[in-house]
Every structure is written in structure tokens, then in C-alpha cells.
Amino acid sequence: MVVTKLATQRPKLPSVGRLGLVDPPAGERLAQLGWDRHEDQAHVDLLWSLSRAPDADAALRALIRLSENPDTGWDELNAALLRERSLRGRLFSVLGSSLALGDHLVAHPQSWKLLRGKVTLPSHDQLQRSFVECVEESEGMPGSLVHRLRTQYRDYVLMLAALDLAATVEDEPVLPFTVVAARLADAADAALAAALRVAEASVCGEHPPPRLAVIAMGKCGARELNYVSDVDVIFVAERSDPRNARVASEMMRVASAAFFEVDAALRPEGRNGELVRTLESHIAYYQRWAKTWEFQALLKARPVVGDAELGERYLTALMPMVWRACEREDFVVEVQAMRRRVEQLVPADVRGRELKLGSGGLRDVEFAVQLLQLVHARSDESLRVASTVDALAALGEGGYIGREDAANMTASYEFLRLLEHRLQLQRLKRTHLLPDPEDEEAVRWLARAAHIRPDGRNDAAGVLREELKKQNVRVSKLHTKLFYQPLLESIGPTGLEIAHGMTLEAAGRRLAALGYEGPQTALKHMSALVNQSGRRGRVQSVLLPRLLDWMSYAPDPDGGLLAYRRLSEALATESWYLATLRDKPAVAKRLMHVLGTSAYVPDLLMRAPRVIQQYEDGPAGPKLLETEPAAVARALIASASRYPDPERAIAGARTLRRRELARIGSADLLGLLEVTEVCRALTSVWVAVLQAALDVMIRASLPDDDRAPAAIAVIGMGRLGGAELGYGSDADVMFVCEPATGVDDARAVKWSTSIAERVRALLGTPSVDPPLELDANLRPEGRNGPLVRTLGSYAAYYEQWAQPWEIQALLRAHAVAGDAELGQRFLRMVDKTRYPPDGVSADSVREIRRIKARIESERLPRGADPNTHTKLGRGGLADIEWTVQLLQLQHAHQVPALHNTSTLQSLDVIAAADLVPAADVELLRQAWLTATRARNALVLVRGKPTDQLPGPGRQLNAVAVAAGWRNDDGGEFLDNYLRVTRRAKAVVRKVFGS
């Protein structure tokens, strides 16, 4: 018979499962402690407290180890845990959060008593005295000194962590993050004082030590230290003394052994500089050599130990330089470099888990705050504070950022720092890496350690994931808003609630710091955008902070802002435009990069704005790549064919060409196309326009019987024939005709010439679009020869009169438009000239070499730099192409694969046939690609054809970015260009025999 117990008689003790203990031996461990036998309220409360530990199993394992240590006094501890709720909260939270502090307690089992009763942390001065007393008490026992100091430091961290964590287990006061960080800095100060005392005694003995000041930097200097962090220091000496460096080195050694790593890398000249300098030496360095980041680092400087008077003199001398740093000539360049360096530090595979360096992470907050301090503290002393939280408050009070934004940024910053603290406490290791999102156990532990509770929809881990996402997004948004929203408020309509601290002068300073060379002009553009009437102005006010931030990373933010204003005014009636930028951040970010890099593409976008909608990604990738050049060509030709009037037909063709050029240029600038793909696409659209113009002109010029007197073919020459057109390339062509049946040559040529002339005139009509110039000067007899010849006339000319340069030009001949069959017959005819069965004559080769030498000395434009002229300069396009063509002239009769109009494909054949060593061919290939990228980039940046790379400066930086260089360092890009072309020139000389 089964007897059911009354509810009041059932055991009160919760089961292992209800306690959340998942280790299989958990039940045995509870039994070992005797916690499973008593059903009184004290034991029930004890077990529920244990269950609330961030990792209850880890806490239980540590308790077992403590109970097994005879020095713990387990009976006393057990009894205290049953009676003292505050002790349970402190001990269980520490053991469930920190494996390292659990190990410390097991190694020092009496330290649990530090967590009993009313725990009061010692003051800054009390800490210093206690650590120095520990040193004094250990005199004569050097072997135990480091151990005793380490134990004392860990005991303090144990107490602080227990107070910090207790609220996760029991209803204990929550210790504010700022208090925890400041208390950790106090401990670091005391530790450094003890280490300095040891070092002075070790190095100086009974003699007076040298006067040294130790300046804390970074988070220690700002009193916002982590549980585990390197402590950055700078040493200042009163005078030169050989003992200075010995004392400093010994201090760092002792501190690193007992407490934490001490790093002096922020000193002048970094690790290569002297460890200790006099104050005068520091002043001289910062006056002459220091970089912007070094002044930024000084924002956190604080004398901590050593000679206090010397430390204050150090601050008095250097801090005025910090507040003037934004006036330095290279301030903007260095700030931009620092911003990019922060982004590049994080490996892509962990970027989403990085608390410090990831997007929306701690460094975003710290960098933004420090930059605003550097810009505005020059004229506002209230901003001259060290800690990030204090600086945010001061910026809000001063009106440099909105008060609500300051409060939100502070809350996000403190939340992220709290997570950082919890991650570091676990093993007392320096880390900023969140657990893998798939590691459910680790995420749950972090959530509980951070006192995050389930919310009814998600468990603690789910709440943490949502909160992290929210905070990262908020930081990212506020990061841009901090920089730009007050600027807009200072110039916007009254409804924007003007930030009272942001004068136009201050706004200009901030824009200058963010990379704008003409800040007052930029403010005018911004004012014009946000002060538009109605909805447009309001939307711009919302959009601009983020758009301006993205644009500030572009090489030319001033030009980009002007282009954005012009584009916005041109599209004022297009409702989709601002909606797209508002709702699709990826589109907006890409557009800002394009506008801030190129003068060529923005002009096209104003007349082909729908291309902007292709800046987003589709299911298969970037929509800019969904368009096939061949499909565009077919559509262009078909569109033109619908108009009987040639001018309207070409206007339609220009519209499609404009759209395609905008697409190609955009994709190129965004790094979505290889340079060879760009050249092929540009060639394709040029050929399509040419075909459309030829078709429409033939239709409009037919005689009454609608029978064309001749067939016409257009032969592409030069880069058009090689499908290697750039943005600024001419289209070199020749026209060939063949009389229709019953039509004599003279009439056929006359009619065909009229067609060719009208096509050239129609395409060459001045336009706001990039020009469509046809150059027919490579035809027989050049400008003096007839524009159109029959096939027979060409054959007769080349057979009898062909000059070496004309033979060379024919190497690039390719039928591109008009009658395809006639075009192919032309190519077969010229094959006899360009690829003769026995090769070209030695005289022809000599003539080619002579012409090449003359071009090098005569054709380079006056004032051009031969080292950086992408077309005619050393190792430039002409060098590579002439080298390839010389080898074709010499060997094409033996190597049929050299019957090829493409430079790159011909280089492949040259290497495969071993006509030139493969390594040399690779040098030629890289030079051609490098020069082509640079030449294309020049047009994209300047908006007009040019071949000369600019000197150092913003324009060269823009060319570097447009050419796909890995950063915007124009000097680095130029060095690479010079190196690649110099090596290629050596190969050119070998091939040409000079």
C-alpha cells in the first residue's frame, strides 16, 4: 500500500536538478559537505544561494576543495555559511565566477574570512601603507617577498570582486562600475609604490635613491582599470643618473612578478627609446617629434608614485601641448590613420565577439571621446578630465554632445566594461573576447555573472545576446552621432534644439579634426541640406550624422560632401532617394565612399541616379554585378534602333551608356571588379555605342531604293582592339567598305565616307557625359589618307607601302562593329602583313626600336615626370605594350598563339613559349596591371582623362584608394608603383637590347 505524504511533510531540500547542478558527481559532493541531510530552513537557504552562483557546479567544486584543506577551518566556514547571508553571497558569487580566485582561496584557505561581516575596502592611502609595510616586514627575506606581495594583492582583488559580484547571489548592494575601476587603480598605485620601494632598496642600498616620478597612463592613469590589465607607465627623472634605468627596470620586474605586467612602451620613441628620461628630455621630444597618438595617450597621464613634485611638473609642462595638439599640421592625417588602424586590428573571424575593438565596442567609445577632448578642450577646461565616463559627462554638460546621448553612451560603455570585467575574472587573464555564440554554457555563465536574469521571453543567455546586440548597435549609432549631431544642431533650424556648447567655430574645429579641409564650406553644405523645407530637411538631419561619418573615411570628404549636396538637390523630387539611404545603410555607406573618392562617378549618378539602387546586395551578391556587359550592349543597340532620327537614337544610346559607366565606375571604386573586367566592360559599351551609331546612320542615309551602296565594317585598333579600354582611353578605329553588287568603288567609298564622318560628328557632339571621340589616325597615311578605303585598297596599300609602325599598329586590329563578315575578311587580309610567314624583317625591328627611343625622348608631355607618367613613363603602359608587340613581330610566325590583340593574353603565350623568362613576364604583367589601375583611378578621381600621377597629398591618396590599394596611404601606393615599374623597365631594356 502506497502512503502519500502530506505536503507539509515533504522534504524541503531542493533536488540537484532544481539547483541547476549538472555535474554528475554533484549529489555526492553535496553529501560530502553534509548539505543534503538537513531539511531546516538554513540549509534550504544555503542551497538556493549556491544555485544562484553564476556557475554553481564550479562553486561546489571549489567548496569541496576548501573542505578538504585542513587549514580552512571547514566547520567554522560551514557554520558561517549557514548563518551569514552576506558571506554566502560574496563567497558563492566569487567561486561561481572566478576559477582563479577559487584557486587562490584553496591555496590561502584563511582568506575566506576577509569576506565576513561588514567588509570595508581600505582607502588609497591605507592601501599604499599596507603594501609598503609588507615590503618593510619582508626585509631580509627576499625569497618570500614576491609571494607575500602577490598574496596581499590577490586578497584585495578577492575582497573587491566579492563585493562586486555578491548581488548576483544575494540581495546585496551593487557596486558601480566606476567604483570598481577606481578601486582597482588604487590597488595598482599601491602595488607600484611597493615595487618602487623594493627596486630602490635593491639598486641603491643605503644610498638615497634617484628622484624618479612614475606616470601612470591608459586605464590606470584614468583610474578606470580592469581586473586584469597591463599597467602603462612612463618614467621621469630629475637628472641623468646611471641608476635611473636600473631602478625602473627592477621596479617593472618586481611588479610584473607580483602583480601585473608593467609596460613602458608609451614612452618617447616606444620600446626603442630610453626607459627613463629627464623632464627636459621629455619636453624636447614632445615639442619636436611626438605623434598625435602620443598626445592622445597623455590625456590619461597621472603621477602615481615616486617624486610627486616632479610628476606634477611633468604634467604642467606637457598638458598644454596636449590641448594644442589639434593645431598640428598632421593632426587630421594621423587621426584618420588611427581610426583605420583600430578597425584593422581585429581579425575578421572574431570581429563579432570582440568587446574592445569590434564594431560598436569599447574602443569606438574611447576613441570618439578622446578625439572630442583633443578638439574642444583647448578652449574648454571642463573637458580636461581623464576617465571616459567623466569625459562623457563633461561633453554632455558642455553641449558638445547631447545630454541624453552622453547618458546612453555611458550606460552602454559601462555595460560593455562590466562584461569585460566578468570575462577577465574567470581566469584572471587579460581578454576582451566574448564566448562563441554557439557555446550555450559559456554564454549562460557570462549572463549570470553579469547579473542578467531571464525576462519571460528568453533565458539569461538569450537576454544577454539581445542586450549585446542592442548595445553594439547603440554604440555604433551614437559613435557617429557624437561627432556630427551637435554640428547639425549648431547650423540647423530652431526645431533641432541647438546644442548650447557648439559654436560655429567649435563646429569647424571638429570637422577639421574629422578630415574636412574646408570646414566652414562643409558647414554651409550641411546647413543647406538640413535647412530644406519640410520632410527633406528632417530626413537629412537624421541621415547626415552617419553619412558624414562614413564620408570622413573617404579620401576627399570635402568633395564628397559637395557631391552629396549636388546629388541631393538634383534628386529633390525623387522620393525613393532619401528613403533608400535611410532604410538601406549598406547603400548609403557605399555611396559615401564613392562620392568621397571620385569626381567621375557622381556626375554620372546625377543623370543616372537609379544606379544607386544597385549599390545593395541581392541574393546572389552585389546588384552592381548582376548586369552583364553583353546584355547592356544588346539593350543599347536595340534602344537606338527604335528611333529613326539619328540624334534621338544616339541620345538614347548615351543614356544607357551613362548608366553603364556609372555602374562600372561604382563597382570599380567599391572593389567589386578586377581591372581586366573593368576594361572589358568599358570596351563592350563603347563598341555597342559605335554599332548603334553606325546602324542608325546607315538607316538614315539609305538611297531611295533602300539598298546600301556598300557594306561597312569598323576595325578597332589600340586598346579598343585589345578590349583594354580605360575610362580615359581614345577609341582608335579604321573604316573599311566593300561596294554592293553593281556599285563602283568611288560611289561606295563616297557614301561610306559620309557615313563615317557623320558617325564621328554625331558621337563627338559636346556633351556633359564622358566624351565619345573616334580617332582614325592609325589608318594608312594617317590624317592625310582617306577616312574609308575598300578592302582591296587596304590590301594594296599594306602590300606595297606598309611602314613598320603601321604593321605594329595592326597587331591590335580587331573587327568591332558593322558588317561582321567584312570585318573578318579584313583581319584575314592584314594577317599577311602583321604575321608574315617568315616574320618581319630585321630592318622593321630596328625601325620599331628607333621609334620607341624617339617616343621616349620626344612624346612625353612638357613638365611630366617620366617616373610617374602611367602611359609613356618608365615601365608604363607604352613600355609594356611595345615590348609585347616587338615579341609578336619577331615570333608570331612561329607561335600562332601570339596572333592575339590582348596584352595580357599575349604575355601568357610569351611565358608559355619561353620567349622571355617567366619571372620577367610576371614583372611585365604586374606593371601593366599596376599602370592600368593607376590610369583608371586618375580618371575616376579627377573626372577627366590624365596620365600623370599627382604628387603627395589628398589627391594621390584618393588615387590609391580608387586603384584598390589596401589603404589610403598615397605614399605607400606610389612607392609600390615606382618599384613595380622600375623592375619592369629593366625587362623592357633587356628585350629591346638597350
Swiss-Prot record:
Pfam families xref list: GlnD_UR_UTase, GlnE
Keyword Nucleus: no
SUPFAM superfamilies recorded: Nucleotidyltransferase, Nucleotidyltransferase substrate binding subunit/domain
Example GO molecular function: ATP binding
Span list, region Adenylyl transferase: 492-994
InterPro entries: GlnE, GlnE_rpt_dom, NT_sf, PII_UdlTrfase/GS_AdlTrfase
GO biological process annotation, one example: regulation of glutamine family amino acid metabolic process
Enzyme Commission number: 2.7.7.89, 2.7.7.42
Record-annotated disulphide pairs: none
Further comment: Was identified as a high-confidence drug target.
Family designation: Belongs to the GlnE family.
Function, as annotated: Involved in the regulation of glutamine synthetase GlnA, a key enzyme in the process to assimilate ammonia. When cellular nitrogen levels are high, the C-terminal adenylyl transferase (AT) inactivates GlnA by covalent transfer of an adenylyl group from ATP to specific tyrosine residue of GlnA, thus reducing its activity. Conversely, when nitrogen levels are low, the N-terminal adenylyl removase (AR) activates GlnA by removing the adenylyl group by phosphorolysis, increasing its activity.
Protein name: Bifunctional glutamine synthetase adenylyltransferase/adenylyl-removing enzyme
Organism whose genome encodes this protein: Mycobacterium tuberculosis (strain ATCC 25618 / H37Rv)
